[in-house]
């Protein structure tokens, strides 16, 4: 059943399987729809680049657990990627480190930006990197 003038769209994998041109057109339609403050879209998708273009808020579920639920821009400003030595990583407050990868060449960590000393450079994180770090940390 379709409503004539819906105020909310509930979509599951709405852009999955579409070629890039059509996907871009569909995303533009979604953005036009949400320009009206009374319109919202609840979307589930594995295509994270689409979520970055469409969503204002992100809820990230993994194996039935809600890992994140926050405004997208806040998430991206709150978290960052730190590349450093293993020794530098050990000197950080453990609460600042949300996930990490250790290799023979050093460490890369998903961190809370505001808890990292200004002497260390924290790089921006994408939603995809954020999700991958969080999932792999739980594996």
Show which residues each predicted segment covers.
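Helix N-cap at the start of a conserved alpha-helix in ABC-type nucleotide-binding domains
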Residues: 20-22
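Short loop immediately C-terminal to the Walker-B catalytic DE motif
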Residues: 15-16, 48
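ABC ATPase "signature
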Residues: 69-70
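Catalytic Walker B motif of ABC-type/P-loop ATPase nucleotide-binding domains
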Residues: 9-13
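C-terminal coupling/interaction segments
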Residues: 99-139
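Conserved H-loop
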Residues: 38-47
